[in-house]
Each structure stands twice: as C-alpha cells, then as structure tokens.
C-alpha cells in the first residue's frame, strides 16, 4: 500500500526592502545598548537595582495620577506608546538624567 508523499519543493519568496522598515527600533534592553548602560553603574547587578528602583517610581507615579497626589516624579523622557516603566528607566539612565548613589 503506497502513501502519498508531500510536495517538498520550496518556492522563492521575494522580500520587499521597504517592508523591513515598517517596524520601529525596539526599546528596552536592546536599545539603549547594555554595554553603554553598564558604563553608568559599577556592575550589572548595580544597574539592575538602579533601573528597578526607578521603574518602580515611574509605576507609582502612574498609579497615583488618578488620586491627585504628586508624590513621585514622572518619566523624564517622552514615553512611547505602551512603553514599560523599566524601558523608560533604562532610557533615563542612558541619557544621564538621573543622579544615583550606589548603596542607597
């Protein structure tokens, strides 16, 4: 009894070069580059803590907006559409917009 074989030929696909630019440059860990971010902290662990603390402040800022309390400082860079607080914090660190003392 013979079984039908699937056609295994591949067809060439033409890629439109203008379609490649349809997507924005990714933000966050890939942009700004991690190597440039590491220049702003003594270690990768210090960078993680630094960025996480700032991301928490940004998140708390957004959460307090509805209450009318302005206890936290909002983003110091223009946030992108649906950009995460950690990505915003990374861009602020990269832009040297924050003052930071390690160990606090």
Curated annotation (Swiss-Prot):
SMART domains: RNA_pol_Rpb6. Keywords: DNA-directed RNA polymerase, Nucleotidyltransferase, Transcription, Transferase. Its EC number is 2.7.7.6. One of its GO terms (molecular function) is DNA-directed RNA polymerase activity. It catalyses: RNA(n) + a ribonucleoside 5'-triphosphate = RNA(n+1) + diphosphate. One of its GO terms (cellular component) is DNA-directed RNA polymerase complex. One of its GO terms (biological process) is DNA-templated transcription. SUPFAM superfamilies: RPB6/omega subunit-like. NCBIfam families: rpoZ (TIGR00690). Promotes RNA polymerase assembly. Latches the N- and C-terminal regions of the beta' subunit thereby facilitating its interaction with the beta and alpha subunits. Belongs to the RNA polymerase subunit omega family. The RNAP catalytic core consists of 2 alpha, 1 beta, 1 beta' and 1 omega subunit. When a sigma factor is associated with the core the holoenzyme is formed, which can initiate transcription. This is DNA-directed RNA polymerase subunit omega. The lineage of its organism: Bacteria, Bacillati, Actinomycetota, Actinomycetes, Mycobacteriales. The gene is rpoZ.
